[in-house]
A protein has these predicted regions:
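Hydrophobic helix-and-loop "lid/oligomerization" segment in the mid-to-C-terminal part
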Residues: 2-22, 26-60, 68-75, 156-313
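Short alpha-helices
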Residues: 104-171
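Glycine-rich, phosphate-binding/catalytic loops in enzymes
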Residues: 35-36, 94-97, 117-118, 170
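Short, motif-level signal for alpha-helix interfacial/capping segments enriched in acidic residues
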Residues: 1-5, 80-81, 132-134
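Generic enzyme active-site microenvironment
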Residues: 19, 23, 79, 101-102, ...
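Solvent-exposed alpha-helices and their adjacent loops that cap or buttress functional pockets
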Residues: 70-71, 92-94, 108-109, 140-141, ...
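Active-site cofactor/cluster-binding pocket
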Residues: 60-114
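A generic local secondary-structure boundary/capping motif
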Residues: 68, 89-91, 115-117, 138-139, ...
Length: 313
């Protein structure tokens, strides 16, 4: 991948705003804060902002920056780990002078002035690792590397996803060479709290299993909030179903109410082998071939999507 255009845009900009997707995971925030830190460490005087409204509670992260409309309008916006513009966690990114998209999702909805896409990468953090490593004249600090390693580790599920390649492992090696405490980082991002442990028990005891191969659970708002979780955190527990050998397709759905009080469903969908992102796309969602998401499903949508997922086992 030719990173020269991205580097040149960063060099020329006085103000840079960095965005990522809604319901952020460690790859989204890891790539965001890694890029911010790398720019700040190498380009003194630039104004760099990490934008977004939502947070993830998987590991500890810096706070997002509070940014005015005027700042965004005078910036270049770099949008990370976001397949389509509807999923950017702050619609004001569109006000920027220029928009650069850096992503590892299939580019089914290109947006922005510049798109740097590598959909064979296991994580956007993998892409940025090679970007930073390409230009060895710049500082690539351990702090930047740790942000990236968190995202790489979680999006590849500890190097177990089917899009983990030798390039993914090479990226991990580059990051490890900065002196990271790999064991500590792994525990930080994967270990459960007591609440998380109890919530895992809830998921296991309430999972529906069809044909001994398709597993799903629907978690209502009252339940996940009682464990101190938001909806995004609750859906991130979808990985707990991956350890069952017989489950080839699995999903976690959370409920919410719209303005009229109607129940809607958001879901995290996973498959060990067969493609499912085309199913997500039928309902306005998307993602990777074997890891996708959907939002704002009606009860009728739920019936349909469960039937379609069941057919992919």
């Amino acid at each position: 991948m030719d990173f020269s255009v991205l580097l040149e845009e960063i060099k020329q900009a006085d103000t840079i705003t960095i965005f990522r997707h809604v319901s952020p995971d460690c790859d989204a925030v890891g790539s965001q804060f890694a890029l911010k830190n790398w720019i700040e460490e190498n380009f003194e005087g630039k104004h760099v902002y990490a934008c977004g409204k939502e947070v993830t509670h998987q590991a500890e992260w810096p706070d997002n920056d509070k940014v005015s409309d005027d700042i965004i309008a005078s910036s270049i916006a770099i949008v990370l780990d976001t397949a389509n513009k509807q999923r950017v966690d702050d619609e004001r990114f569109a006000q920027a002078l220029r928009i650069i998209k850096v992503d590892h999702h299939p580019d089914r909805e290109p947006f922005g002035d510049i798109c740097l896409i590598n959909d064979s990468a296991a994580a956007t953090c993998e892409i940025l690792t090679f970007f930073f490593d390409t230009y060895k004249e710049y500082v690539f600090s351990q702090k930047t590397a740790e942000y990236l390693y968190r995202g790489l580790l979680t999006d590849s599920l500890n190097y177990t996803t089917n899009n983990t390649t030798q390039e993914t492992l090479k990226a991990g090696g580059i990051l490890a060479s900065t002196g990271l405490d790999l064991s500590k980082i792994s525990h930080d991002v994967f270990d459960n709290s007591i609440r998380g442990f109890k919530f895992t028990g809830y998921i296991i005891s309430h999972t529906e299993v069809l044909d001994n191969a398709f597993a799903y659970v629907i978690i209502d708002e009252e339940t996940y909030t009682s464990y101190g979780l938001n909806a995004s955190d609750a859906r991130s527990f979808v990985g707990k179903l991956s350890n069952v050998r017989d489950f080839s397709v699995y999903a976690v759905f959370t409920t919410k109410k719209d303005a009229s009080g109607k129940t809607l469903y958001d879901g995290s969908l996973r498959s060990k082998k067969n493609r499912i992102n085309d199913i997500a796309e039928k309902f306005g969602g998307g993602g990777h071939a074997c890891a996708a998401g959907v939002k704002n499903l009606t009860q009728e949508n739920m019936t349909n999507i469960l039937n379609l997922l069941r057919k992919r086992i």
